[in-house]
Amino acid sequence: MNKNFMYGIGAVKYNDFVIGYIEKGSFDLNGQKAEAAKIEAEQAPGAPVLIIPQSNGSIAPTFNVIQTDYKNLHAMLGGTLHYAKEDTEKNNPIGWTAPQAALLMQGPFELELVSGRSILIPNGTLLSNLGGKLTLTETAKIECTLEVAMPEDGSQPYGVFDSKTLPEEWGEHKLPAAGAAAAASVQSEEATSKEG
């Protein structure tokens, strides 16, 4: 598999919960361009004299979940699961009712791609609602937007890694520190120059 490309959503994971089937063609990274203020001068027509960065580019993925079994509705929208009276162990829900208060799914998300990479988001907030058309050619769906926020420790908002070799820090739902990555890169360059 060529790892020079990122494509195909394999799974969306919240903590260790795998969110159900994603509607074909609905997943969009929804990338936002970086913003900058352009300072222009009368004496320099045609081009700015200074560009001041305002914000980095960001992502806010959107997607539709079409697997609307009761447990998935409960996990993604909140509310209450209902069980038959004889189901004392509450194994097989027979219904779901919507929540009275807003559900906040906030925490670590992993977007595992078919191409062999994963997008790791330490601090995401999933906003979702029940939507779709009830026809014989479409299904109801849970319409989702995953907002990416800065982690509490001020580290990077997201990162891309090989799915088979996720960083050790991800065990604690954190990304490697930028300084550690830079130091590893310098050490790697020094080792390469000594070999040559």
How would you describe each model-predicted region?
Residues 1-73, 125-141:
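Solvent-exposed edge beta-strands and adjacent loop segments
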Residues 13-14, 111-115, 150:
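Short acidic, glycine-rich loop/turn motifs
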Residues 19-20, 71-72, 113-121, 154-157:
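Short, surface-exposed beta-strand/loop "edge" segments at domain boundaries and coil↔beta transitions
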Residues 21-31, 104-116:
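An acidic intrinsically disordered interaction segment
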Residues 60-64, 108-110, 143-147:
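Beta-strand secondary-structure signal
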Residues 64-68, 78, 114:
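Histidine- and/or cysteine-centered catalytic micro-motif in compact active-site loops
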Residues 77-113:
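Extended, positively charged loop/linker patches that create polyanion-binding surfaces
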Residues 118-196:
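Mixed-charge, glycine-accented linear interaction segment located at domain edges/termini
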